[in-house]
């Protein structure tokens, strides 16, 4: 049964052009070619990268964040309340107005007190600034290393500058060691990102990030198995060229170096727009749609490859819109307000609210309505603070 399923899955009539068979992609005469089973090595490597990442964050990024003055915002914990906690965990973090009124009645609280409890409870679950700094530090180091390695591997290759050469003598293109190791490293990294996604900072484009990671993993595995490494390597290098700039911008933002953060964000935006909205459709999509079938008639693998690339392009357009929103805010207000994808810190209470609307914490219990807050202006100042950072792809 397994043999039949494997034969059906790797049917050469599906994945390869006419008159091309898997036998032609076997190693021969000292030449090495990609094999689908090679991609299995990426799984243990991804697990190793997860270990390396948490080691890096714990022993390098965390001390570095303290040395650079990154400090977490002090958050007031929500008062223990079994009824509100049950609703928060079971029915949602943001109750409707009718649910809020019902919960307030059940708990003997005012509507403002109930709203304040949910605000504080949501803020408790939001990642701290140090955690974000550590995540971005790891991604910055890895993206930068991948971009440098990819540039070194591809710089002298003719298809880097002339994408149509990706299809010369296809699929009889021997696998070079440098390209193999870089490709496997990229695949392992994206698998590790998928593994740690539940533990990473969640943003409003979480679903789009999941789609992106899945599509990228499938695209890398698929292109490797079908010896489409040339065009696949161009896609990877194009993406790596902007990602490290984004993470660098975030790092400076967490350090509150506003001018450096804004400058890097503008540079990132220009690189992103040029690589994702200009080069990707005109150089990558054009050659995969039209130039790739110069010597072959369309086949299933051709359509599958282009569907994956179009999905990536749609994600590029989506993220470009978010970046444009950030740039509009920058032009209008003179600095980056916040990431439009961010799960931002909510204000504990506005300056005009009375103390009774959001009771202050004292020894784990709420003060009676009308009582003066114990921390005075500091609580209002902390309440105004929001978590700001730039968007990621």
Swiss-Prot record:
The keyword Amino-acid biosynthesis does not apply. The modification Phosphoserine is found at residues 342, 349-350. Disulfide bonds: none annotated. It is found in: Endoplasmic reticulum membrane. It is an enzyme of class 2 (transferase). One of its GO terms (cellular component) is endoplasmic reticulum membrane. Gene3D superfamilies: Homeodomain-like. InterPro entries: HD (IPR001356), Homeodomain-like_sf (IPR009057), Lag1/Lac1-like (IPR016439), TLC-dom (IPR006634). The last loop motif confers selectivity toward stearoyl-CoA (octadecanoyl-CoA; C18:0-CoA) to behenoyl-CoA (docosanoyl-CoA; C22:0-CoA) as acyl donors. Ceramide synthase that catalyzes formation of ceramide from sphinganine and acyl-CoA substrates, with high selectivity toward long and very-long chains (C18:0-C22:0) as acyl donor. This is Ceramide synthase 4. It comes from Bos taurus (Bovine). The lineage of its organism: Eukaryota, Metazoa, Chordata, Craniata, Vertebrata.
């Amino acid at each position: 049964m397994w043999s039949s399923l494997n034969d059906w899955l790797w049917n050469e009539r599906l994945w390869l052009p006419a008159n091309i068979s898997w036998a032609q992609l076997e190693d021969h005469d000292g030449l090495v070619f990609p094999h689908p089973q090679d991609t299995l090595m990426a799984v243990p490597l991804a697990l190793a990268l997860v270990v390396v990442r948490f080691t890096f964050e714990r022993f390098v990024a965390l001390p570095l964040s303290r040395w650079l003055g990154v400090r977490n915002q002090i958050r007031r914990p929500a008062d223990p309340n079994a009824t509100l906690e049950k609703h928060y965990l079971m029915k949602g973090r943001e109750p409707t107005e009718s649910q809020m009124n019902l919960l307030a009645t059940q708990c003997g609280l005012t509507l403002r007190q109930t709203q304040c409890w949910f605000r504080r409870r949501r803020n408790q679950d939001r990642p701290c600034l140090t955690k974000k700094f550590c995540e971005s530090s790891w991604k910055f180091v890895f993206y930068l290393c991948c971009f440098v390695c990819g540039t070194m591997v591809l710089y002298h290759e003719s298809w880097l500058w002339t994408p149509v050469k990706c299809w010369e003598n296809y699929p009889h293109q021997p696998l070079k060691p440098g390209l193999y190791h870089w490709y496997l490293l990229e695949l392992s990294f994206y698998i590790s990102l998928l593994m740690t996604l539940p533990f990473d900072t969640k943003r409003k484009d979480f679903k789009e990030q999941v789609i992106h990671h899945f599509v990228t993993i499938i695209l890398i595995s698929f292109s490797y198995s079908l010896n489409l490494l040339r065009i696949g390597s161009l896609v990877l290098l194009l993406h790596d060229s902007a990602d490290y700039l984004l993470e660098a911008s975030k790092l400076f933002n967490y350090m509150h170096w506003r001018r450096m953060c804004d400058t890097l964000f503008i540079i990132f935006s220009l690189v992103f727009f040029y690589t994702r909205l200009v080069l990707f459709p005109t150089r990558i999509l054009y050659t995969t749609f039209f130039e790739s079938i110069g010597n072959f008639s369309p086949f299933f693998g051709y359509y599958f490859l282009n569907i994956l690339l179009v999905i990536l392009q749609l994600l590029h357009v989506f993220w470009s819109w978010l970046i444009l929103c950030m740039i509009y805010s920058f032009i209008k207000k003179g600095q980056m307000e916040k990431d439009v994808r961010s799960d931002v810190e909510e204000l504990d209470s506005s300056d005009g609210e009375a103390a009774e609307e959001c009771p202050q914490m004292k020894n784990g219990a709420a003060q009676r309505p009308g009582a003066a807050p114990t921390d005075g202006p500091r609580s209002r100042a902390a309440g105004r603070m929001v978590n700001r950072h730039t968007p990621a792809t």
